[in-house]
């Protein structure tokens, strides 16, 4: 696939989260300025905990989302899985992008979490729930995320996902340097 993608290509996003969908749309249109895309969000399981608590579990969640999106929708040109997780006192996300022939992956920047947030995570479902409780917000995970709260809106969940997605798209934007890695 070259940078001059002409036909409309369907991008299946393994999430209905608006922050994730916005990031995927932004990354694809930035990476392929001449491309035409249709973006479709699907609700598929990650098959990991609601709040993954390690790098490997988070990565597996993103891979599983792509696999499950492919099983759900066979009509995609690209499949995108994003999974946010925590390892120790930092949060981050893994992004996985697959076509029928290639896979690209990248981990986002890491963000330190306050000690009181880490302590409360032991008794909560997800980081977003704890952030809402500690910061008095509502549904922050579908808005700017923990990162927007802790950076005074200098960064958002979507902006950090955008960077990781651009990096995961490298095999697709430079196909002459990346042979097919999926069979």
From Swiss-Prot:
Its EC number is 3.6.1.73. The keyword ATP-binding does not apply. GO terms for molecular function: ITPase activity; metal ion binding; nucleotide binding; ribonucleoside triphosphate phosphatase activity. Keywords: Hydrolase, Magnesium, Manganese, Metal-binding, Nucleotide metabolism, Nucleotide-binding. Mg(2+) binds at residue 75. Pfam families: NTPase_I-T. GO terms for biological process: nucleotide metabolic process; thiamine metabolic process. Transmembrane segments: none annotated. Belongs to the YjjX NTPase family. Phosphatase that hydrolyzes non-canonical purine nucleotides such as XTP and ITP to their respective diphosphate derivatives. Probably excludes non-canonical purines from DNA/RNA precursor pool, thus preventing their incorporation into DNA/RNA and avoiding chromosomal lesions. Homodimer. This is Inosine/xanthosine triphosphatase. It comes from Vibrio vulnificus (strain CMCP6).
């Amino acid at each position: 696939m070259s940078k001059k993608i002409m036909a409309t290509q369907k991008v299946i996003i393994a999430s209905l989260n608006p922050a994730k969908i916005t990031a995927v749309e932004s990354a694809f249109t930035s990476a392929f300025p001449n491309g035409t895309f249709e973006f479709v969000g699907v609700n598929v399981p990650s098959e990991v905990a609601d709040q993954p608590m390690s790098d490997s579990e988070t990565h597996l969640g993103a891979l599983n989302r792509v696999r499950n999106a492919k099983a759900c929708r066979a009509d995609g040109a690209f499949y995108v899985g994003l999974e946010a997780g925590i390892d120790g006192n930092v949060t981050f996300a893994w992004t996985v992008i697959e076509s029928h022939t290639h896979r690209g992956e990248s981990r986002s920047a890491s963000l330190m979490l306050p000690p009181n947030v880490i302590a409360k995570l032991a008794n909560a479902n997800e980081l977003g729930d704890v952030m809402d409780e500690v910061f008095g917000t509502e549904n922050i995970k579908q808005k700017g995320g923990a990162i927007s709260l802790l950076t005074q809106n200098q960064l958002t969940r979507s902006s950090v996902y955008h960077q990781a997605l651009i990096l995961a798209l490298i095999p697709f934007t430079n196909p002459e340097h990346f042979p097919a890695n999926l069979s």
